[in-house]
Amino acid sequence: MLALVPLYAGAANDDENDSSEQFDWNPVMEAIILVESEGNPRIVNGNQVGAMQITPIMVRECNNILKARGSEKQYKMTDRYDVEKSKEMFLLIQSQYNKSNNVEKAIRSWNGGPNYSNRGTERYYQKVLRRMK
């Protein structure tokens, strides 16, 4: 239900770096997991693996973000099979590219990449919305 998570949610304060940490992405992540893998963390579909169907490009992008932020943390390709680490990667991507915590943008870009089209991601977007609690 959209009543639990608005489609556009601003940060609780003006600090953009903290906005995704303050916003509750759990309903979105859980719905994406159900759509992507029915919750199976071992699923493989081409180069997309794990509960959130993360690609090697996504892992590299997360590592680039971490490096740019001065972090020594780095994700491994096997981390895609770990649901909690997959969620961390999702949150990291949101904190970098979706600072306004726009749920629609998060869902569509998870499916279609940063240059998604509404038309190309509409089916996926609707499936995720139906799975949100």
Predicted feature locations:
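Catalytic glycan-binding domains that act on GlcNAc-containing polysaccharides
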Residues: 12-133
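Hydrophobic h-region of N-terminal signal peptides that target proteins for export
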Residues: 2-11
